[in-house]
C-alpha cells in the first residue's frame, strides 16, 4: 500500500459492527486519538496488532497491557473493554468467526490459538521485533 493513511478509520461504524458479528474474516485499520474507553462484545475472535501507541484491555476479569509491536488475542463472545494509555493508538484488527475456523480441517485442532490467552501467555506476544511484526502486517494487507 502506498498511502496507509487513506485506509485509517475508513469504515462506517454500523457496517463495522455488523462485520464483526457476521463476516467470516474481517480486517480493519484504525487509529484513536483520544483515550476514551469502550466496552463491547462480538461473535468473532479478534487479533489486534498494535503499530503505534498502547492501551489497557480488560477481557472478562483479566487486565492486559498492549503497546507497539504487540499482539493481543480476544476470544469470540468474550466481553472486553479498552482504554488507550498512549495515543494515537494505531492498530490492525483481524477478526475471524469461530464457526468458520472450525469448518477448516487444518485449523480445527489449533482452535485454542483463537481463544483469549491468560495474561502470562499474552506477555509472549509483546515486544515483537520490527521485522517479524512488519511481516505480520504485510500478511494482513494481503487478506
Label for each model-derived stretch:
Residues 1-26, 79-143:
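A hydrophobic/aromatic-rich effector-binding and dimerization subdomain
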Residues 16-20, 37-41, 49, 63-64:
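Short secondary-structure boundary/capping segments within folded domains
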Residues 25-42, 51, 79:
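Conserved short histidine dyad/triad with adjacent acidic residue
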Residues 33-34, 68-69, 77, 97-99:
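Tight coil/turn sites that cap or link beta-strands
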Residues 35-42, 59, 82-85, 105:
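Short histidine-centered beta-strand/loop micro-motifs
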Residues 40-57, 73:
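Short, conserved beta-strand element in jelly-roll/cupin
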Residues 44, 68, 88-90:
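A structure-centric signal for secondary-structure junctions around beta-strands
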Residues 61-75:
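Short acidic-glycine-tyrosine-enriched beta hairpin
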Amino acid at each position: 500500500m502506498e498511502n496507509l493513511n487513506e485506509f485509517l478509520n475508513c469504515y462506517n461504524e454500523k457496517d463495522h459492527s455488523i462485520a464483526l458479528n457476521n463476516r467470516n474474516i474481517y480486517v480493519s485499520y484504525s487509529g484513536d486519538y483520544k483515550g476514551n474507553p469502550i466496552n463491547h462484545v462480538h461473535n468473532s475472535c479478534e487479533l489486534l496488532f498494535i503499530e503505534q501507541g498502547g492501551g489497557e484491555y480488560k477481557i472478562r476479569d483479566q487486565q492486559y497491557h498492549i503497546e507497539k509491536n504487540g499482539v493481543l488475542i480476544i476470544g469470540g463472545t468474550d466481553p472486553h473493554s479498552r482504554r488507550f494509555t498512549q495515543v494515537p493508538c494505531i492498530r490492525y484488527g483481524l477478526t475471524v468467526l469461530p464457526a468458520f475456523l472450525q469448518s477448516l480441517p487444518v485449523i480445527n485442532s489449533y482452535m485454542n490459538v483463537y481463544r483469549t490467552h491468560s495474561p502470562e501467555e499474552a506477555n509472549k506476544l509483546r515486544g515483537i521485533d520490527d521485522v517479524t511484526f512488519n511481516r505480520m502486517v504485510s500478511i494482513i494487507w494481503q487478506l
